[in-house]
Amino acid sequence: MNIYLKKFIDEKFKKPGKALDLGAGEFFDVACLKQIGWKCEGVDIKNGVDLEKNYESKKKPFDLVYSNYVLHKLKNRKQLIQTIFNNLKNEGWFFIHTFDKSDKNSKSDLSQVYLKKLLMEQGFKNIKLRVFSFYDNDIGHKHWHKILEATGQK
């Protein structure tokens, strides 16, 4: 499981709730959350959900909506931010990881300023952003990334 997502959950939630993973990939985070008692739904292009378009779950609203390493790939980034907002319950939390524009190993043009603007325009509150370095130790990678993290509430 994304260790930063786990830390965020441990800080913000006293007990398991409902979560939505936008861009779930191999559904690893979904499986990990289920193991610790969360009710979790994951969607991805692999199961027919195009995040360039609006997605509203039949299981909404969620306590947590998160997306890891998807936003920088999308052309319609405002749509993903709106999808997060529309699937969250009031006072629910979001968590986003993507690559920062300073990352030399990805093709991202995202900055803290731009992402904060998108989030504020959508109506999110308690927004926190940070950029940090992370060593990607996966097979065939072995390099550093600059991660852009955004969290906040509806």
Where are these regions (language model features)?
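Conserved beta-strand signature within the Rossmann-like core of class I S-adenosyl-L-methionine
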Residues: 91-99
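Core SAM-dependent methyltransferase catalytic element
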Residues: 137-154
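A short glycine-rich, Lys/Arg-flanked "PGG" loop and its adjoining helix->strand segment in the class I
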Residues: 78-90
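Adenosine-cofactor binding site in Rossmann-like domains, unifying the SAM/SAH pocket
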Residues: 40-57
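Conserved alpha-helix/loop element of class I SAM-dependent methyltransferases that forms part
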Residues: 1-16
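Short alpha-helix
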Residues: 108-123, 130
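A conserved beta-strand element that flanks and buttresses the S-adenosyl-L-methionine
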Residues: 66
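Conserved class I S-adenosyl-L-methionine
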Residues: 16-25
